[in-house]
UniProtKB/Swiss-Prot annotation:
Functional summary from the UniProt entry: Intermediate filament-associated protein that associates in regular arrays with keratin intermediate filaments (KIF) of the inner root sheath cells of the hair follicle and the granular layer of the epidermis. It later becomes cross-linked to KIF by isodipeptide bonds. It may serve as scaffold protein, together with involucrin, in the organization of the cell envelope or even anchor the cell envelope to the KIF network. It may be involved in its own calcium-dependent postsynthetic processing during terminal differentiation.
CDD domains associated with the record: S-100
Chain intervals for the UniProt region annotation (23 X 23 AA approximate tandem repeats): 938-1507
The protein, known as: Trichohyalin
GO molecular function, one term: transition metal ion binding
């Protein structure tokens, strides 16, 4: 076994091991996949037990989000892991370095390495993205370490301040005479410490500058190396392209050599063929002279056939050569396409390398930004003057670095553009060379075709000459051929006559075989009926036992539920009581219902199923349309993304577009040529088809002539058969007379058996009455009413029969009383047979009622046979029969009641499960235990069923023995009666003549009734056909309307999304512009504030010098003047801000209004155009459907009519041939079959309902588990993201961000939950509808087979009529087919024309859309470049999101594309929300900074005032205290103390 096969075997083995654990054996649950990842891939994954890693793999793996991982998804992750291992192996063994050395030396493994690189390129990209993520995480860790260092420094400063604060307190406690000396010493110490700190900062700054120089030098070296690598790669690419060119040229030369060789061989073959034909012609002339007339004739026929073949095959020969040329052209195009793909892959490799270089540069830039942030932190410890100086130096340095970066970026872009221009020039050169090659190839092809056409013309001229010679030979021997044809026609006629004779014999044998098969089928049906009756009795008993078992199960289930549901128990008990009351009420109502209501319910169910099927189809269509929309949106986004990536090459793209347009023009011309070629070929095919059609018509005419002759003979045969049937009818009438005599004796014996049977049934009924006493009253009332109706009917019949008896007594008054009863019984039986036949046609849908009526009729017949003293027994028997009917009706109702009870039980179980799921998640274990218990009970039930079956079989054997004994007794009695009948035969002969006359009249009346019924059926069938056609038209109209509305809504939605996207882009652009303006204003404001601050400081110094001379009122005036100045300045700023905001809002509203109007106009135009096109398409489809459906409907209607006619004839035959017991047996058999079918269907429905509910519950449990896992995973992801944001942001943003994320999380969870619920609901409805439709189809298939079996006999009798009808239908179909072909050709031309127009319009729209998107993207990029560079966190998040987007996009291309759109939409929404959130945060930050700045200004003003006031006060106290200096020194009013307090307030946490 090869390593590949062994690996595949191991993969499938592992999958099957885990899949067979808990699921259906074909898929993995997420829990099993998690275990598999942790166990099998633990050594490969970086953190195998990390929940983040495993959950991320699970989220990426389950692309269809069904909670299960199938084998395809499992294979995808296995291949990803294998690719990761391959990449890790290369890194560990240092393959990359060795391969780089080999490349410099010209290693021969270079091509193989490129192929591997191309093959594993997506995996390498993903690994690169993961490596970048790890680097970013490491950078975050470094930032955290820096923050911790800063915190430690701040703590040291705080401790130092605390020490100083303690020293100050000690100074205050010391004597006041030493305070000034200690204060001076402390100031000196503080200055020395500051000096040391400045020296240390300078040393650190020098070290950083040296490190920066080293890094810049390294960066320059890296750039040099990268440029060298790029040059080397460019050289390698050029070498590879040259190799490819050489390979292409060699292939083209080789191909030309092959074509020349083929042409040479073909020319030699043609020359050889011409020589052979010339030799054959000479031989034929020689043989003509020597051979006889017959041989010449035969040779002539063969030569004619050859000539026809050559004519026919000359055209395919040309077509074959043409197809060969087309194949060669296709091969050349494929080779060219392959070369272009290879060139494109090389360009993509270079683009990826450039992206890597840019990423490295961005990382270096981030590192420099971090160092700058560290420098800013260090400056916080310096004094204000030093901080100001350092800040200015940093600003200058930042500007210089920004300029340098901008220069480097421009230099890179310039180099990149130069490289791109060179590539573009190379590509243009290649395209020009390609065009030149194509032109050369075209000239060669044209020359070859010209040569070939010349040869073909020569060959055709020679062919024409041969045909002329053949025509001369044909004219010479034409007379002889006519004679030969006459002989052949005579021979054909003889063969046809022989075939007809054989066909008649075969048909006769088939009829005989059919009769034998019918006899066997009747016997089998009788056996099946008996078997079904036995099974029916068994099922009745089983149903009773099942009812008891269900009640026991219900009790146990309620006991178990009481343990877990204390509060819910009361509600469930009330529900159960209500259901029991409802059940009793329904049972009382159902006793009065008949089978008609059941049929109406079935009709309603069918209608509901039809509605559900339509709803499912509509949902399916909507899903398909949604998928198509998502596909369109994906394509549009892909185009936009590609266009954004190529913005910096706008001019080059425009030139490329012009070239592409020219190439497309050429391609369109080529397509037009191909289309014309296809049309020419199609016309040739049409001509061939017309020739074949003419031949078919000729054959059809001959066939019709033969069939006409055959039908005439068949008509003669039918007349003979009709005469024979009349003879047989007479014989049957004779046999019927004899049968009636025998039946009289048989009835007496049957009456005795009936009495015994009734006694046994009475005993069984008594047992049943003991079980069902609670239903007796209601059933008795119903039976009494039925008995009264039955008595009235019997009274009418009795009067009629008494009149008949009186007439018979007048004619046969000399006969004995016994004979009179027999004669009366005979006439009554004949009358009853006629009534039974009519009732059977009328009551096919009410078979239960028919059986009851039949039993009553039998009772009446028995009462007439017996004497009057048995009338009391008859009443008791009627009562017993009523009890039998009652028991049977109850048995019939029992399955329905059981089904309803089971439904209620299932509903209760479902509700209780829902409540348990909401309150007790641990109840899943109980459900599994219940499932095991149900399986155990089912096993016990099957064992009990087998025992009961054995008991029933013993009972049936006992009844069979009794029946045989009675039959023997009846045989003995029959022999005795036959002796008596022989004596009376002479007397009855005269009576039989009169009876025959009555029978004839009876048959005539019966025939009239049949004709009326036939007419009614025809009318009913036509009415149904019209209704069906009308329904079909309405459905089609409704579907068209729905389709049109759906497309209209989709178009509106697409336009709205586009408008929303444009508005969003415009709004983001304006927001960024406003942000930039606000930042500029803030900077100006800061400069203004700085200028004001310096001005105030100078003013304060001047004021301090003049403060001694001024009075106390002057500081107050100055403060008032400063306050007014600040207030006015603040008012001016607020007004300017308000004016800017109003102007911005006004511009935004105007632009939004203009965009809205334009988009509305475009949407209206597009909607009207598409609406017109859709209406036209729908009309065409409707006409096509109607044309296709009309012949089918007509055939279906005729077929149904013939089947119904055959059914009626078959029933009439069976009624005439079979006896009354057979009719009864057939009726009972059908009834039992239907009962059994109903029970089987109900049992199957119950089973399906149980399985469906079980699957739904299991699915609900899985969905809940999946939902919990998703929530847990989302929660962890959000918590981690929140932690990162909290570290990066300041303390004042925490509360606001937390609230915003919680609201966003709630919204997403609600939307996700709603989508999941909607999807699950639709899936369950579809599954249920599919089951119902499958059940309906199976039922229809079974009914159809049953009808087909019954109709076989009648179809064969009417074979001749069908032939005639089929011939008419065939001719109509031929005409319709021709019309459809012509219509299809016309539609094809119209479709081609429309397709070309649509293609051109789509091309124009695409180009306009492309330009608009390019313009918008260009503006967007220009605005993005102006954003603030210090937004590091936003940049990092965007990179992470883009990397995730690319990884998910690559993964989704390998798997199912249907889910990609949803994920991308969520990703875009998240980015949009993130962008808006950041914008709101920044705006809020800006407001906070402004407020903080105002507060700081106010605090500075107050502080300066308080400082001035305290200095004045201190000076006054010093001047006043001349006698007692240092007595009360103002320690807290010094500027040094205020400075310390300010520093402490800044660094205090």
């Amino acid at each position: 076994m090869s390593p590949l096969l062994r690996s595949i075997f191991n993969i499938t083995k592992i999958f099957n091991q885990y899949a067979s654990h808990d699921c259906d054996g074909t898929t993995l649950s997420k829990k099993d996949l998690k275990n598999l990842l942790e166990r099998e891939f633990g050594e490969i994954l970086r953190k195998p037990h990390d929940p983040e890693t495993v959950d991320l793999v699970l989220e990426l793996q389950d692309r269809d989000r069904d909670g299960l991982i199938d084998f395809h998804e499992f294979l995808a992750i296995v291949f990803k892991v294998a690719a990761a291992c391959y990449y890790a192996l290369g890194q560990a063994s240092g393959l990359n370095e060795k391969e780089a050395k080999c490349e410099r030396k010209g290693n021969p493994l270079q091509d193989r390495r490129r192929e591997d690189q191309r093959r594993f390129e997506p995996q390498d990209r993903q690994l690169e993205e993961r490596r970048l993520k790890r680097q970013e995480l490491e950078e975050l860790a470094e930032e955290e370490e820096l923050r911790e260092k800063q915190v430690r420094r701040e703590q040291r400063l705080q401790r130092r301040e605390q020490e100083e604060y303690g020293g100050e307190e000690e100074l205050q406690q010391r004597p006041k005479g030493r305070e000034l000396e200690e204060l001076l010493n402390r100031e000196q110490r503080f200055e020395r410490q500051e000096q040391r700190e400045r020296q240390r900062l300078q040393v650190e700054q020098q070290q950083r500058q040296r490190g920066e120089l080293r890094e810049r030098q390294e960066e320059v070296q890296l750039q040099k190396r990268e440029t060298q690598e790029l040059q080397r790669e460019r050289l390698e690419e050029e070498q590879q392209l040259q190799k490819q060119k050489r390979g292409l040229e060699e292939r083209l030369l080789e191909q030309e050599r092959r074509e020349q060789e083929l042409r040479r061989k073909e020319q030699e073959r043609r020359e050889q063929q011409l020589r052979q034909e010339q030799e054959e012609a000479t031989q034929e002339e020689i043989s003509e002279r020597g051979e006889s007339r017959t041989s010449r004739c035969q040779w002539q026929l063969e030569s004619e056939a050859d000539a026809r073949q050559r004519k026919v095959y000359s055209r395919p020969h040309r077509q074959e050569q043409q197809s060969r040329r087309q194949e060669q052209e296709l091969l050349e195009r494929q080779q060219e396409q392959q070369i272009s793909e290879e060139v494109q892959s090389l360009q993509e490799d270079q683009g990826r390398q450039r992206l890597k270089q840019e990423q490295r540069y961005d990382q270096n830039w981030r590192w420099q930004l971090e160092e700058e942030s560290q420098r800013r932190r260090y400056t916080l410890y310096a004094k204000p003057a030093q901080r100001e100086q350092v800040r200015e130096e940093e600003q200058l340095r930042l500007k210089e670095e920004k300029l340098q970066r901008e220069k480097r970026r421009q230099e890179r872009e310039r180099q990149y553009r130069e490289v791109e221009l060179q590539r573009e020039e190379e590509r243009l050169q290649r395209e020009e060379e390609q065009l030149q090659r194509e032109e050369r190839e075209k000239r060669r092809r044209q020359e070859r075709e010209k040569q070939y056409l010349e040869k073909v013309e020569l060959w055709e001229e020679e062919q024409l000459q041969r045909e002329e010679r053949e025509k001369r030979r044909q004219e010479r021997e034409k007379q002889y051929l006519e004679k030969v044809e006459l002989r052949e026609e005579e021979q054909l006629q003889r063969q046809e006559r022989e075939k007809r004779r054989q066909e008649r014999e075969r048909q006769y044998l088939e009829k005989v075989e059919l009769q034998e098969e019918e006899q066997l089928q009747r016997e089998e049906r009788e056996k099946r009926r008996q078997e079904r009756e036995r099974q029916y009795l068994e099922k009745v008993e089983l149903q009773e036992e099942e009812q008891l078992q269900r009640q026991e199960r219900e009790k146990r289930r309620q006991e178990r539920e009481k343990q877990y549901l204390e509060k819910v128990e009361l509600q469930e008990e009330e529900q159960l009581q209500r259901q029991e009351r409802q059940k009793r009420r329904q049972e009382r109502e159902k006793q009065y219902l008949e089978k008609v209501e059941l049929q109406e319910e079935e009709q309603l169910q069918r209608q509901e199923r039809e509605k559900r099927r339509q709803e499912r189809e509509r949902q399916y269509l909507e899903k398909v349309e949604l998928q198509e929309e998502e596909q369109v949106q994906r394509q549009e986004r892909e185009k936009r993304r590609q266009e954004r990536e190529r913005q910096y090459l706008e001019k080059e793209l425009q030139r490329q577009e012009e070239r592409l347009q020219e190439e497309e023009q050429l391609l369109r011309e080529e397509r037009e040529k191909r289309r014309q070629e296809r049309e020419r070929q199609y016309l040739e095919k049409v001509e061939l088809q017309e020739e074949e059609q003419l031949q078919r018509e000729e054959r059809e005419k001959r066939r019709q002539e033969r069939e006409r002759q055959y039908l005439e003979k068949e008509e003669l045969q039918r007349q003979e058969e009709r005469l024979q049937r009349e003879k047989e009818q007479l014989q049957r009438e004779d046999r019927e007379k004899r049968r009636q005599v025998r039946e009289r004796k048989y009835l007496e014996e049957e009456l005795q058996q009936e009495e015994d049977r009734l006694q046994r049934e009475k005993q069984l009924l008594r047992e049943d009455r003991e079980k069902r006493q609670y239903l007796e009253k209601v059933e008795l009332q119903r039976e009494e009413e039925q008995l009264q109706r039955e008595k009235r009917r019997q009274e009418r019949e009795r009067q009629y029969r008494e009149e008949e008896l009186l007439r018979e007594e007048e004619r046969l008054h000399r006969k004995e009383q016994q004979l009179q009863r027999e004669e009366c019984e005979k006439r009554r039986r004949q009358e009853l047979e006629r009534q039974l036949e009519e009732e059977e046609l009328q009551r096919l849908d009410r078979k239960r009622q028919f059986r009851d009526d039949d039993q009553h009729q039998n009772e009446v017949r028995n009462s007439r046979v017996y004497s009057k003293h048995r009338e009391n027994k008859e009443k008791s028997r009627q009562l017993d029969d009523s009890w039998v009917r009652e028991s049977q009706f109850q048995q019939d109702l029992r399955p329905l009641q059981d089904e309803q009870e089971e439904k209620r039980e299932r509903e209760q179980e479902w509700r209780s499960r829902q409540k348990r799921d909401s309150q007790f998640p641990a109840e899943q274990l109980l459900e599994r235990e219940q499932q095991k218990e149900t399986e155990r009970r089912d096993r016990k039930f099957r064992e009990e069923e087998q025992l009961l079956k054995g008991q029933r079989e013993e009972k049936i054997r006992y009844l069979e023995e009794d029946r045989k004994f009675r039959e023997e007794e009846q045989q003995l009695r029959r022999l005795e009666r036959e002796q008596q009948l022989r004596q009376e035969r002479d007397r009855k002969f005269r009576e039989e003549l009169s009876r025959q006359e009555r029978d004839r009249k009876f048959r005539e009346e019966e025939q009239l009734l049949q004709e009326r019924e036939e007419q009614l059926r025809r009318q009913e069938r036509d009415r149904k056909f019209r209704e069906e056609e009308q329904l079909l038209q309405e459905r089609e109209e409704q579907l068209r309307r729905q389709e049109r509305d759906r497309k209209f809504r989709e178009e509106e939605q697409l336009l709205q999304e586009r408008e929303e996207q444009l508005r969003r882009q415009e709004r983001d652009r304006k927001f960024r512009e406003e942000e930039q303006q606000l930042r500029l204003l803030e900077r100006e404001q800061q400069l203004r504030q700085e200028r004001n601050r310096k001005f105030r400081e100078e003013q304060l110094l001047r004021e301090r010098e003049e403060q001694l001379r001024l009075q106390e009122g002057e500081p107050q005036l100055r403060q008032k003047r400063d306050r007014k100045f600040h207030e006015e300045e603040q008012l001016l700023q607020e007004r300017e801000e308000q004016l800017r905001r109003q102007e911005r809002d006004r511009k935004f509203r105007e632009e939004a209004q203009i965009l809205k109007e334009r988009e509305e106009q475009l949407r209206r135009q597009e909607r009207d155009r598409k609406f017109r096109e859709e209406e036209q398409l729908l009309q065409e489809r409707e006409e096509l459907r109607r044309q296709e459906r009309e012949p089918q409907l007509r055939q279906e209607r005729d077929r149904k009519f013939r089947e119904e006619e055959q059914l009626l004839q078959e029933r009439e035959k069976l009624r005439r041939q079979e006896r009354e017991p057979q009719l009864r047996q057939e009726r009972d058999r059908k009834f039992h079959e239907e009962e059994q079918l109903l029970q089987e269907r109900e049992e199957q429905l119950r089973r399906q309902e149980r399985d469906r509910k079980f699957r739904e519950e299991a699915q609900l449990l899985q969905e809940r588990e999946e939902q919990l896992r998703r929530q847990e995973r989302d929660r962890k992801f959000r918590e981690e993201e929140q932690l990162l944001q909290e570290r990066e942001e300041q303390l004042r943003r925490q509360e606001r961000d937390r609230k915003f994320r919680e609201e966003e999380q709630l919204l997403q969870e609600r939307e996700e939950q709603l989508r999941r619920q909607e999807r699950d609901r639709k899936f369950r409805e579809e599954e249920q509808l599919l089951k119902e439709s499958e059940e309906q189809l199976r039922r229809q298939e079974r009914d159809r087979k049953f009808h087909e079996k019954e109709h076989l006999l009648r179809e064969r009798e009417e074979q001749q009529l069908r032939r005639q009808e089929l011939e008419g239908v065939f001719s109509q179909e031929e005409q319709l087919r021709r019309a459809e072909q012509e219509e299809e050709q016309r539609r094809q031309r119209q479709r081609d024309r429309k397709f070309l127009e649509e293609e051109q319009s789509l091309q124009r729209e695409r180009e306009e859309e492309k330009r608009r998107v390019q313009e918008q993207d260009r503006k967007f990029l220009e605005q993005e470049e102006q954003l603030h560079r210090e937004e590091q966190e936003e940049l990092r998040r965007r990179q992470q999101l883009d990397q995730q987007y690319r990884a998910e996009e690559q993964f989704a291309r390998e798997e199912k594309r249907r889910r990609q759109e949803q994920e991308l939409r969520q990703e875009e929404q998240r980015r949009r929300q993130e962008r808006e959130r950041k914008f709101r945060e920044e705006e809020q930050l800006r407001r906070q900074q402004q407020e903080e700045q105002k507060r700081r200004q106010e605090r500075d003003v107050q502080q300066s005032r308080r400082q001035v006031w305290e200095e004045d006060k201190g000076r006054r106290q010093v001047l006043e205290a001349g006698k007692r200096q240092f007595a009360s020194a103002p320690v807290r009013s010094s500027p040094l103390y205020e400075y310390i307090q300010e520093q402490r307030s800044q660094y205090r946490p």
